[in-house]
Design a protein with these regions (language model features):
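Amphipathic alpha-helical coiled-coil segments
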Residues: 41-56, 132, 136-155, 209, ...
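Periplasmic alpha-helical coiled-coil/stalk elements that build and connect Gram-negative outer-membrane
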Residues: 51, 133-248, 360, 364
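Membrane-embedded beta-strand positions in outer-membrane beta-barrel channels/transporters
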Residues: 98-100, 144, 246, 312-314, ...
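Small/polar, glycine/serine/threonine/aspartate-rich low-complexity segments that form flexible
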Residues: 67-103, 230-238, 271, 284-317
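Bacterial Sec-dependent N-terminal signal peptides
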Residues: 1-25, 36
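Bacterial Sec-pathway N-terminal export signals of envelope proteins
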Residues: 19-69, 75, 221, 227-264, ...
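Short flexible linkers and secondary-structure junctions
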Residues: 20-143, 281, 285, 323-326
Length: 390
């Protein structure tokens, strides 16, 4: 409700604010965006998505692995000496080294679809971050205006107390001259007490609103926290029709963009699941060599002479995997349907908020006009009442 009220007020009034002292609305919003925990979490999620994009980008490159091993053996073994088979105790050791690589050639278009999905997920995460900033900005604007509203109410209540005291003093003087009854004096005195009680209540409301705002922007302590005294210029402007606002919001609202990116990404998610239906082709190669202490040759000669090379292709053809791939595709399609429903729901929610804000703005405009008329009438009534007791 507060959100709609803020949007409505902003739609009716073009407010030019010049800060005199304390925190301005812009400063409150900037501070909250920098320190709000939810926004910082959303920013980290966006960074994680960026890392995922980088990972998917280089998935087609070959991998390269090196390995080295050293082993020792002790025990009895059978050897042939001449025509005899004998068992002797021996100790030996061996060394091996290798370098291998593997290159994906065809993966059923899994790699390009994973890269496309990662980029869309990054865009969605960035849109989520913008939505978090929008939400905190609206909440702070609402709390900021509530502080100013309560502050103004308190000033009005203090003015009412002074006015009641003046009326009480005037009636008391008239009573001394016999021109006012004791009942009128008692009534004026009671009005002073009632207005003083109202002033205390409005002061409490102002302090609580200020505390809420300081907590919302993540201030460590509310001590010394105050708002800038704004110089406000109000200009009534024609309201933009809600349908026109809605069409503009569809292309700019972060929540809509995030839902659209996720729906688009679900198409690639289906293709990733379908890639398991296709054969997988890869190329591999390796280089290796080894040394055996049981061979009567030095280390360098053996490492050179035992050097081996290998290259080959590997083709994997899926035949039957207990319907796992089929069910993954079904799950991906259901997820796509959910993302489509989520987008529709986000659009409906946006249109509802715009309609509510538009009617709130219309009511605010009417209330402002009638309040101005009532204020002028009250001033005229006050002048007449003052003349009555003078």
């Amino acid at each position: 409700m507060k959100k709609n009220l803020i949007i409505g007020c902003m739609a009716v009034f073009a407010v030019s604010v010049q800060a005199q002292e304390g925190w301005t609305l812009r400063q409150c919003i900037d501070y909250a965006i920098e320190h709000n925990i939810s926004i910082r979490q959303s920013a980290n999620e966006a960074k994680q998505s960026a890392v995922s994009v980088n990972t998917a980008k280089w998935a087609r490159l070959p991998n390269l692995n090196g390995s080295a091993g050293q082993s020792w053996n002790w025990g009895r073994t059978d050897v042939r000496i001449g025509d005899e088979q004998k068992y002797i105790s021996v100790s030996s050791h061996s060394t091996n080294m290798s370098l291998s690589t593997n290159v994906p050639i065809f993966t059923g278009l899994q790699i390009p679809n994973q890269y496309a999905l990662a980029k869309l997920n990054l865009k969605a995460a960035m849109a989520d971050l913008e939505k978090a900033k929008e939400d905190i900005s609206i909440n702070i604007a609402s709390a900021y205006l509530q502080v100013l509203f309560n502050q103004e109410l308190h000033q009005v209540s203090l003015g009412q107390v002074e006015l009641s005291k003046e009326q009480y003093a005037r009636i008391s003087r008239l009573a001394e001259l016999g021109k006012a009854s004791p009942a009128e004096v008692a009534e004026a005195k009671a009005r002073v007490a009632q207005d003083e009680m109202s002033a205390v209540q409005t002061d409490n409301n102002f302090r609580l609103a200020l505390l809420d705002l300081s907590q919302l922007i993540e201030l460590e302590t509310p001590e010394g926290f105050s708002l800038a005294a704004p110089v406000v210029k109000l200009d009534l402007e024609p309201l933009t029709p809600p349908d026109e606002v809605y069409q503009t919001a569809l292309s700019t609202k972060a929540a809509i963009q995030a839902a659209q990116y996720r729906l688009e990404g679900s198409k690639h998610n289906i293709r990733i699941a379908q890639s398991a239906f296709y054969p997988q082709l890869s190329f591999s190669g390796s280089l290796g060599t080894n040394y055996y202490s049981t061979i009567d040759r030095n280390f360098g000669d053996q490492m050179r002479d035992n050097f081996s090379k290998y290259v080959g292709f590997s083709l994997s053809v899926p035949l039957f995997n207990r319907f796992t791939t089929r069910n993954r595709v079904r799950t991906a399609r259901l997820q796509q349907e959910n993302y489509s429903l989520q987008l529709d729901n986000t659009k409906k929610t946006l249109y509802k908020e715009i309609q509510q804000a538009w009617y709130t703005a219309l009511a605010s405009e009417s209330k402002y006009t009638s309040s101005s008329t009532a204020a002028n009438a009250s001033m005229e009534s006050f002048k007449l009442m003052s003349e009555k007791y003078d």
